């Protein structure tokens, strides 16, 4: 029984550490950029869009498609950063599971 109690305590401790890491990640802002930084997207670690900035040079009513492509590029850049940070942050817990 003592072994099971220790496992439960370890699991609870890990859960608290994971929750703390998730909260820290959610509070972090990631900045994704398109080519030449013409579109910049800011997202939180929990993948909420905070801000999107367009350089004057990219705002052309006759070429909306380029603006759309650059926006997607900036968002995907930020999302990739979030995924990497999540793997790094949460991957640390994988080897610590008591079972």
From Swiss-Prot:
Gene3D superfamilies: Nucleoid-associated protein YbaB-like domain
GO terms assigned for molecular function: DNA binding
Record's keyword annotation contains Kinase: no
SUPFAM superfamilies per the UniProt record, alphabetical: YbaB-like
Compartments in which it is found: Cytoplasm, Nucleoid
Top-level taxon: Bacteria
Keyword Metal-binding among UniProt keywords: no
One annotated Gene Ontology cellular component of this protein: cytosol
Keywords assigned by UniProt, alphabetized: Cytoplasm, DNA-binding
Chief location of this protein within or outside the cell: cytoplasm
Cross-referenced Pfam families: YbaB_DNA_bd (PF02575)
Transmembrane region(s): none
Protein family (similarity comment): Belongs to the YbaB/EbfC family.
Subunit structure comment from the entry: Homodimer.
Main function: Binds to DNA and alters its conformation. May be involved in regulation of gene expression, nucleoid organization and DNA protection.
Name of the molecule in the record: Nucleoid-associated protein stu1598
Naturally occurring in which organism (per UniProt): Streptococcus thermophilus (strain ATCC BAA-250 / LMG 18311)
Organism ancestry: Bacteria, Bacillati, Bacillota, Bacilli, Lactobacillales
């Amino acid at each position: 029984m003592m072994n099971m109690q220790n496992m439960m305590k370890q699991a609870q401790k890990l859960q608290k550490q994971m929750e703390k890491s998730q909260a820290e990640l959610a509070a972090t802002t990631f900045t994704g950029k398109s080519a030449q930084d013409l579109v910049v997207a800011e997202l939180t670690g929990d993948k909420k869009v905070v801000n999107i900035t367009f350089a004057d040079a990219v705002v052309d009513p006759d070429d909306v498609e380029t603006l759309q492509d650059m926006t997607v590029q900036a968002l995907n850049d930020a999302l990739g950063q979030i995924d990497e940070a999540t793997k790094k942050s949460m991957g640390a817990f994988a080897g610590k599971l008591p079972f």
